[in-house]
Structures are given as C-alpha cells and as structure tokens.
C-alpha cells in the first residue's frame, strides 16, 4: 500500500513543533501562544476525521513545525540547538513506541485525556489548572515508560513551576503527534530512506502557505 506522505509529513511536523516549543520554553521561558495552543489542542481530538483535523484543519497551524522539520532533516550538526531539536524529536518517537507496547499506559492515558476534556468545560486550555493536569499526565503515565527526555536550557527558567508544566504538557502533545505519525504510516526508517520525499512535501505545503507556486 502506497504511503500518504502528506499525512506523514503533517504528523511529523506536529512532533517537530512540540520539540521546538520545548526548546524555546527551556531557553527563553516563552513561546508563541497560538502555536502552543495548536499543539495542546491536538491532545483532545482522539478520533479525528483527518490528520489535518488534529491540528485545527489549517496547514498554517503547523507552519512552525514544518519549518522545524526542514531544519531537522537538513541539519548535519551534532552540536548546539539543532542537535537538541533532533534529540527531542527522536526521543518522542522512542517514547511513543514504549507507550504503544504498554496496554496499561495506553488505558491510563485514554482515561486521563477524557478527564482533561471534561475539565475543558470549566477552564481555558492554556490555564495553569489544565497545564498542570497535562504535565501530571506526562509525569505519571509517560515518564515511567523511559528513557526520560532530558530537557536542557536555562537553569533559572527550568526551575519555574509554570515553565516545567508547559514543557511537560508540550512533550505530551509531542507524544500525541508521534502516535498519529505511526497511525498514518510513519516510521523512523523514513527519516533516512525517504528524507527527500519528506523534505519536498514539507516545502510544498510551506509554498502553499506563502502563496508561492510549486
């Protein structure tokens, strides 16, 4: 069966978007609220009609992730911020496989997300209450699966509880995107064997957003 590289690229961009948000939060203590909301919202749509629907049905919602994806695929750097992005992205993929292998964790995650959905009736998605709840899901359901993702950045920033919660909530969103990536036919071998297909697909989507003919 032929792979749908459009869906695969969108889901992969979702992973990369979360990875880059984590990096920005850890180093700068801030990130785009709109981009963050796109990633966090993806946690609540577990039965989407399409891959794009997970991210609000707008390709523009993944522009940040698509640009990050190109940076990751085109990078040969083994050091610095680029290497950090690649490490976060690959670590999320590894954790997703651990999650997929644990029926208990999958059940726990599903029930906790349902609780989260109910809380959304009373609180804003990016409220401290919901960010704390999402962070708790990551710490209690995902982290024990191991290996833990070591987030690096400014020690002063990373000691801030609100930043810690945002980072963990964003990592949880990255796991959601990694689950989606597997569901639409994604796999780590593609990063090497189908790199050009992924690059071209990402460039094509970005060109549409810019209004540039492809």
Swiss-Prot record:
Going by the UniProt record, its keywords in alphabetical order are: Cell inner membrane, Cell membrane, Coiled coil, Cytoplasm, Membrane
Predominant location category = cytoplasm
- Cellular compartments annotated: Cytoplasm; Cell inner membrane
- For the keyword Cytoplasm, the answer is yes
Record's GO cellular component terms: cytoplasm; plasma membrane
Q: Which Gene3D superfamilies match?
A: HflD-like
Superkingdom, natural source: Bacteria
InterPro entries (UniProt xref): HflD, HflD-like_sf
- Give the membrane topology, semicolon-separated if more than one: Peripheral membrane protein
Per UniProt, what is one Pfam family of this protein? DUF489
- Spell out the family assignment given in the record's similarity comment: Belongs to the HflD family.
PANTHER family per the UniProt record, alphabetical: HIGH FREQUENCY LYSOGENIZATION PROTEIN HFLD
Q: What is the protein name given in its UniProt record?
A: High frequency lysogenization protein HflD homolog
Q: What is the lineage of its organism?
A: Bacteria, Pseudomonadati, Pseudomonadota, Gammaproteobacteria, Enterobacterales
């Amino acid at each position: 069966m032929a792979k749908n590289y459009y869906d695969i690229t969108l889901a992969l961009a979702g992973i990369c978007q979360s990875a880059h948000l984590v990096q920005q939060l850890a180093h700068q203590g801030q990130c785009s609220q709109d981009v963050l909301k796109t990633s966090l919202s993806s946690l609540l749509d577990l039965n989407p009609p399409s891959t794009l629907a997970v991210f609000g049905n707008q390709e523009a919602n993944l522009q940040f992730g698509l640009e990050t994806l190109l940076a990751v695929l085109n990078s040969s750097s083994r050091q610095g911020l680029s290497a950090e992005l690649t490490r976060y992205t690959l670590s999320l993929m590894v954790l997703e496989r651990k999650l997929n292998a644990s029926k208990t964790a999958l059940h726990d995650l599903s029930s906790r997300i349902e609780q989260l959905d109910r809380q959304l009736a009373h609180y804003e998605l990016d409220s401290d209450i919901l960010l704390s709840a999402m962070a708790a899901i990551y710490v209690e359901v995902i982290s024990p699966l191991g290996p833990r993702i070591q987030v690096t950045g400014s020690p002063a920033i990373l000691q801030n509880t609100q930043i810690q919660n945002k980072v963990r909530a964003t990592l949880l969103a990255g796991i959601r995107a990694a689950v989606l990536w597997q569901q639409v036919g994604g796999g780590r071998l593609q990063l090497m064997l189908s790199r050009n297909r992924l690059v071209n697909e990402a460039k094509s989507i970005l060109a549409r957003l810019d209004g540039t003919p492809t």
